[in-house]
Amino acid sequence: MSTLLVDADVVAYQVAFSTEEAIRWGKEEDEYAIWTLHSDEQDCVRKIKDYYNTLKQDTQCKEIVSAFSDKDNFRKEIYPDYKLNRTKSRKPLTLSFCREYIMKNYNGFIRPRLEADDILGILATSDVIKGNKIICSIDKDLNQIAGLHYNPTAKEFYGITKKQADYNFYYQCLVGDATDNYKGAPTYGEVKTKKTLSNKKNLWKVVKDCFKGQGLSEEDALTQARLARILRNTDYDFKNKQPILWSGE
């Protein structure tokens, strides 16, 4: 029997956003009117149930874990500007309600200072959950984790090998992630990074050399790597519930 590991941050946000409705209060002939934005929590519940029922049917998984990000984030301790670009974005009205409902009804899972991606990565690569695990997310960052994946939007299963997972990690170190507000190595976009990493054996050495070639230090490379890396079982202290910062290879 397989357990589905769900990126519930995405589920809660998508449901909360999709249930918002703007209403114009006034007659068509009125010069001015009042606009309000509302969301019905019952609509949220219906959509959440539909989403999880569809997941279970499509994946044939009966067991589900819904991972959520903690309010605190260890990456912000490394780099205070991490995800700072998101602070001014308005959150959907019922986001908190959706999180709480999923936590209560779909085996919510949260750990101090970790993001949902980290929780999925740790659970997928450890024996905390017995049997087969399937990572369910649309987030490309989780391609850093070896194992079986399911994209709920495309409704596709795909596998990631350990070698592919490691490559995807080093790739992310160089290109950075504008969405999460860390820059990687200057001048390294997708094409240049793929060419640079192609057919290389010691990818971490390649990454460090790229940073040095841009006038940066090995410490700069390590900082970007720690921001980019999705935690695996080897990156987590289970006893003390603390992330183990990546130190290079």
Q: Where on the chain are the PLM-derived regions?
A:
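A short secondary-structure junction motif
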Residues: 19-21, 73-85, 230-233
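Conserved phosphate/metal-binding and DNA-contacting active-site motifs used
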Residues: 54, 73, 78-79, 92-95
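Short, internal active-site loops enriched in acidic
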Residues: 70-74, 140-141
